[in-house]
Amino acid sequence: MFYLRGCGRWVAASFTKQQFPLVRLSSDSAAPRTPHFDVIVIGGGHAGTEAATAAARCGSRTLLLTHRVDTIGQMSCNPSFGGIGKGHLMREVDALDGLCSRICDQSGVHYKVLNRRKGPAVWGLRAQIDRKLYKQNMQKEILNTPLLTVQEGAVEDLILTEPEPEHTGKCRVSGVVLVDGSTVYAESVILTTGTFLRGMIVIGLEMHPAGRLGDQPSIGLAQTLEKLGFVVGRLKTGTPPRIAKDSINFSILNKQTPDNPSVPFSFTNETVWIKPEDQLPCYLTYTNPRVDEIVLNNLHLNSHVKETTRGPRYCPSIESKVLRFPNRLHQVWLEPEGMDSDLIYPQGLSMTLPTELQEKMITCIRGLEKAKVIQPGYGVQYDYLDPRQITPSLETHLVQRLFFAGQINGTTGYEEAAAQGVIAGINASLRVSRKPPFVVSRTEGYIGVLIDDLTTLGTSEPYRMFTSRVEFRLSLRPDNADIRLTLRGYKDAGCVSQQRYERACWMKSSLEEGISVLKSIEFSSSKWKNLIPEVSISTSRSLPVRALDVLKYEEVDMDSLAKAVPEPLKKYTKCRELAERLKIEATYESVLFHQLQEIKGVQQDEALQLPKDIDYLTIRDVSLSHEVREKLHFSRPQTIGAASRIPGVTPAAIINLLRFVKTTQQRQAAMNESPKTDQCLRNADRLQERQL
């Protein structure tokens, strides 16, 4: 057992009432005992909270280590969850019994479904969240989770031991060293460090170490990871200034009201806590040429923009937007930070100009002429680890039982972090009990696409989820995430409660029964026209028309269909969610059949496992170029399907790999079957003797 670095410099760490005793005395000895857990989670952000609670739900004794307990659940940047693609992740996290979706439903102040003009497969569930309420509700949930201990403290180093021979990796993590020199041991460790790895905050030309405004960065842990051999990169992000609510002239701005009724994030909720009529509006304004002028004239005062470090492509700073898209007007959404908050978040105005120039720029914008900046915008630069160094279970290739989740893997956004956190927590727990990993494939969920993109393609800029990244988005909809993942989460991972599992089973059987009934009801087109006059069905059709086909029409829903045919359809309208999901299933029925065939083809590729111990650099049984060997050696794909998605791995290389896998499988099968074959021959000889 060894520490990677020395423990010569330590500072005192503060602890809360929720701490475990760092020294425990056994009944027969006065010697101190070191605390031991099944899983340790480092970091209390959106990935860390989901990872810790997921591991605890799976039955593991879990420790959540965070710099400060009072920052658990803090929304460091935007006061919102969800959006296009991100709303799908929220539903999938909820399907695995994650926290953030339920907490959002308790804390939302403005709900909106984006992409309503398009089909339900790409609807984006989104909500403005009360920062204070969200943090309170999350902390209450975390501090009352069974098997979960919360501890304040900073991790300085990892405790490493000899690797398990049956797994890849040059060593195994078995605990952590805190900044005060104390040690805590565990079977698995999850890093969810966010922007804290060598984090630097930037405002204008000023830079100072911080993982977040007011919080110290993690230096020692970053050095440990680098010395272990992990490929480390550098990314940056930013946040807008906060504006005093009473200094804004809302009367001249475009007002956006919330949806009524609100669509909850969680499958367990039919409604949200704050009623639509009590929710808050958002307001829209735009930048102008004066904003461009201030940005362009002061680039020399902005070190964050001059840095070569890559920032988020899909959430750029106002400086980046002006440079990339000159002479354009850019949207600025004025979003409330809470029911009782005096602050407004100007979405679209992330900036790192000097503080005095930030207020000067903001007062150039319509409606903000008298705006007061309460907190300046700032940028953050931080370390991340190339995600091609982790497996689809989020365990690292280099260090056994060490898992990464969140921004450490190069992603951006609360939802992407939460999704990784759930998977890391589940797999860290399964690793302790030596069970197979829980992997979501590209054909099963947006979470699968997210992790597959990271582990096979990597990223050189903050990764954001979009519906356009998903090949099978008609099948992977927000409405059916429970059918896709809850059943698996219960059976394969043990992370889902009995109540949620039973609800998902009921919904699945109700949908199957409802679709079967809708298929069985057939009338002529003229009769349907008489029953539902508003439907634009052609009366020239000679064949009978199923009720399921009638439900596909935009003007028809389950209520109108049940009025036309009360028996047996009336019972399917009693549950609003069931009625809406039957409508969606009918809408996509014809295209889903073809997509399911494509999914089966992909699943066949994913079923072809590559040997875990294969050495791509030296193996001679397969013809591969040097470049392909290096790419495969670095990414270490687990299946033929994953290998085919790595840039630079040619179709010819995939064919050669496929031949190698099949030959290996045949050899293994022959070795396994040879004793059975000999026994069969002996039995046949004896039978022939008896017959003679």
Swiss-Prot record:
Compartments, record wording: Mitochondrion
Sites where the protein binds FAD: 43-48, 155, 218, 407
Oligomeric and partner information: Homodimer; forms a dimer in the presence of potassium. Interacts with GTPBP3; forms the GTPBP3-MTO1 complex composed of homodimers of GTPBP3 and MTO1.
SUPFAM superfamilies: FAD/NAD(P)-binding domain (SSF51905)
Segments of skewed composition (Basic and acidic residues): 683-692
Keyword Flavoprotein listed: yes
Transit peptide: 1-25
Family that this chain belongs to: Belongs to the MnmG family.
GO MF term set: flavin adenine dinucleotide binding; tRNA 5-taurinomethyluridine synthase activity
BP GO annotations: mitochondrial tRNA wobble uridine modification; tRNA methylation
Matching InterPro entries: FAD/NAD-bd_sf (IPR036188), GIDA_C_N (IPR049312), MnmG (IPR004416), MnmG-rel (IPR002218), MnmG-rel_CS (IPR020595), MnmG_C (IPR026904), MnmG_C_subdom (IPR047001), MnmG_C_subdom_sf (IPR044920)
Keywords for the protein's UniProt record, in alphabetical order: FAD, Flavoprotein, Methylation, Mitochondrion, Transit peptide, tRNA processing
Cofactor(s) listed in the protein's UniProt record: FAD
PROSITE patterns, sorted: GIDA_1, GIDA_2
Positions carrying N6-methyllysine: 508
Catalytic reactions of this protein: 5,10-methylenetetrahydrofolate + uridine(34) in tRNA + taurine + GTP + A + H2O = 5-taurinomethyluridine(34) in tRNA + 7,8-dihydrofolate + GDP + AH2 + phosphate + H(+)
GO CC terms: cytosol; mitochondrion
Superkingdom of source: Eukaryota
Record's function text: Component of the GTPBP3-MTO1 complex that catalyzes the 5-taurinomethyluridine (taum(5)U) modification at the 34th wobble position (U34) of mitochondrial tRNAs (mt-tRNAs), which plays a role in mt-tRNA decoding and mitochondrial translation. Taum(5)U formation on mammalian mt-tRNA requires the presence of both GTPBP3-mediated GTPase activity and MTO1 catalytic activity.
Record PANTHER family: GLUCOSE INHIBITED DIVISION PROTEIN A, PROTEIN MTO1 HOMOLOG, MITOCHONDRIAL
Name of the protein: 5-taurinomethyluridine-[tRNA] synthase subunit MTO1, mitochondrial
Region annotation (Disordered) ranges: 669-692
